[in-house]
Amino acid sequence: MAEDATLVDETALEAAAGESPPSNATACGELAPSPLLRGKWLKDDMPRERLLRQGPGVLSDTEMIVLILGSGLPGHDVFSVARELLDRFGSLRAMLDATYTDFDGLRGIGPAKKAQLLAIMEMARRSLVDKLRSRSLLNSPEAVENYLRLRIGGRPLEVFVSLFLDARHRLIHCEESAQGTLTRMAVYPREIVRRALSLNAASLIVAHNHPSGAVQPSASDCRLTHTLRDALTLIDVQLVDHLVVGVDSVYSFARAGWP
């Protein structure tokens, strides 16, 4: 679309996006009618202009992606590309877990657009980790849970994450200690113990996701938790918590009394 044009054809945008053109969206994604002028859009109602005037909270998820992409490719309008991205992943949060190959087959997403999206998503993840490093995680359980939901809550396969903490419960290092399938995963406590020693960690928070979304721990989750807790006790490292992570909720072994 031509940036210098004062008016943008509304019908063309609707056909390209498969939805109503960007409007006065709220942060919750609810749309309010856009000011129209004889079936056309004023330039002031385009996503970039509205963001600069009112802030990012007024934009829909589709419009945010439009601004990140900047433009489409020949034959692929940027609004339709943004909508297809959301349809593929289901939400912006799920996009944060995407890999390079997850974007394969999407119309209008070439190598440059893939790299751009992945770089922005990595910046978001690193920003969250930096926030965790600046505080005692023992006093910030919500921050830990929000980060883990964002990092692994939407993953299609099971992932086991270890957060190694210092004596003041500040984050030293976070890593994925194991990856599995849709329903099972092999975690080796001795490897986590070895890693804790190498990082000189004083305590540890571990977490894994349930791709099904149900966060109730299994019998094997409980066995692993107690085995790992006992192994860490032998080297004087505290297991602060084991979290089972879903897209929208988290189960805490510590809050549940270590069943």
Curated annotation (Swiss-Prot):
Per UniProt, residues of the MPN domain are 137-259
NCBIfam families documented for this protein: PRK00024.1 (NF000642), radc (TIGR00608)
Record organism? Paraburkholderia phytofirmans (strain DSM 17436 / LMG 22146 / PsJN)
Which molecular function GO terms apply here? Answer: metal ion binding; metallopeptidase activity
Q: Which residues bind Zn(2+)?
A: 208, 210, 221
Q: Which family does it belong to?
A: Belongs to the UPF0758 family.
For this chain the motif JAMM motif maps to 208-221
Q: Name one GO biological process term.
A: proteolysis
* Classification lineage: Bacteria, Pseudomonadati, Pseudomonadota, Betaproteobacteria, Burkholderiales
Q: Which residues form the signal peptide?
A: none
Name the UniProt key words of this record, in alphabetical order.
Answer: Hydrolase, Metal-binding, Metalloprotease, Protease, Zinc
* Stored PROSITE patterns: MPN, UPF0758
Write the protein's name.
UPF0758 protein Bphyt_3148
Supply the InterPro entries for this chain: MPN (IPR037518), RadC_JAB (IPR025657), RuvA_2-like (IPR010994), UPF0758 (IPR001405), UPF0758_CS (IPR020891), UPF0758_N (IPR046778)
State the Pfam families in the record: RadC, UPF0758_N
